[in-house]
Amino acid sequence: MTIEEFIRTNHICQYPLHSFGINSVAYNHEDAIKIIGYARDNVIPILGGDWLYYKNNKIVLPIDYGDGWYCERKENESLKDYVYRSCSEAERAIRR
């Protein structure tokens, strides 16, 4: 199953960010955790992310948008170890 199929099958809501000039989507906290689990189980690293906020029924970019987190693969790190570490860092960032 692809990530797109996983998102569709699990009825995960995507919030387009085109109005901010960003060619991507956002996910709520609960769905982001599900996606991280899928990535870990399917050996897909998570390269990083940014935090957005929902206020007055709108997605709001924080003043320091773009100052999120990222996870680069270390030299000699196996793909499996990198995936585990990147998914763990993503969970930690989202749960903060």
Regions found by a protein language model. Give the residues of each.
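Short alpha-helical segments and helix-capping/turn motifs at coil-helix boundaries
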Residues: 30-34, 91-96
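Long, contiguous N-terminal structural blocks used for assembly/anchoring
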Residues: 1-31, 38
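Generic amphipathic, hydrophobic interface segment in small proteins and small subunits
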Residues: 34-45
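Acidic, low-complexity, intrinsically disordered interaction modules
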Residues: 43-95
